[in-house]
Structures are given as C-alpha cells and as structure tokens.
C-alpha cells in the first residue's frame, strides 16, 4: 500500500497544483456595477457631463443665456444640477434637475420646463441618465 501511495504521490501533487493554478486563472465574479451606476449620484454625474458638453461647451444658442451650476455633493441624498442666469448666478435657478434613490428617480422642474426647449431637455436628460453619450 505504501508503495502504491509513493508511486502516485508525485502525480497527485501535480494534479493538485494544476487544479489550484486553473482555479486562480478563472475570472473573479464582478459585483453588479449596474446598481451603482443607476444610483442618484452617478446618474447626476453623467447628466452634468452631458449637459456641460452638449449645452454649454458646444456653444448651443438655446443655452447661451444660462450657466450650469452642479450641486452633486448633497447631504440630502438629492444631487442636482441647476441652470442659472449667465450674468446672475446667484439668482433663482431657471431649471433644476435632481435625482434621488437607487435606482435614481429623476425630476426636472423650473421656468425653463414651460418653454419650447423642455422636450429636448427631457430627451437629453433621459439619454444621459441611461448611459448615452451623444448630444
């Protein structure tokens, strides 16, 4: 019996080593990133980046009279971005876009949402909230 074990011991050790190496090569399960990316803060970060690029950096005339004022660090759990008058940033916001919860519940309100541009704002915000990058 000892002889049998001695003759197969190197094979068994090699097999164990191969199994351990194979297990180490397997991809580790990744945590679901979709739940994190659908939370309020990451959603509002995407919206702020999209709004800045498409509405302001591009020189879009529809947003020329406004300035973007992100308020993403919110202790209330409602990160938001504001559109304020360009020459009077301390004035009341003309548009508030905010999110809350996980998955994020979006809300957009203010005087600008009563103007013709409101449909475009709603479409853009939904696209960016869902991960779209375009304008």
Language model segments and positions:
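Post-signal-peptide N-terminal segment of Sec-exported extracytoplasmic proteins
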Residues: 41-81
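Sequence contexts marking disulfide-bonded cysteines in secreted/extracellular proteins
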Residues: 26, 53-55, 134
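C-terminal partner/receptor-binding element of secreted or periplasmic proteins
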Residues: 105-106, 111-135
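Mid-chain, structured segments of secreted extracytoplasmic proteins
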Residues: 77-112
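Extracytoplasmic/periplasmic, Sec-exported soluble proteins
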Residues: 35-46, 109, 113-117
């Amino acid at each position: 019996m000892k002889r049998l074990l001695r003759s197969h011991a190197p094979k068994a050790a090699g097999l164990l080593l191969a199994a351990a190496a194979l297990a180490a090569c397997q991809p580790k399960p990744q945590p679901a990133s979709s739940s994190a990316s659908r939370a309020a803060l990451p959603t509002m970060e995407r919206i702020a980046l999209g709004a800045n690029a498409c509405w302001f950096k591009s020189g879009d005339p529809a947003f020329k009279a406004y300035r973007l004022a992100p308020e993403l660090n919110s202790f209330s759990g409602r990160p938001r971005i504001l559109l304020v008058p360009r020459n009077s940033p301390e004035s009341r916001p003309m548009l508030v876009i905010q999110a809350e919860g996980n998955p994020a519940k979006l809300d957009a309100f203010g005087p600008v949402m009563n103007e013709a541009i409101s449909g475009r704002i709603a479409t853009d915000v939904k696209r960016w909230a869902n991960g779209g990058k375009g304008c």
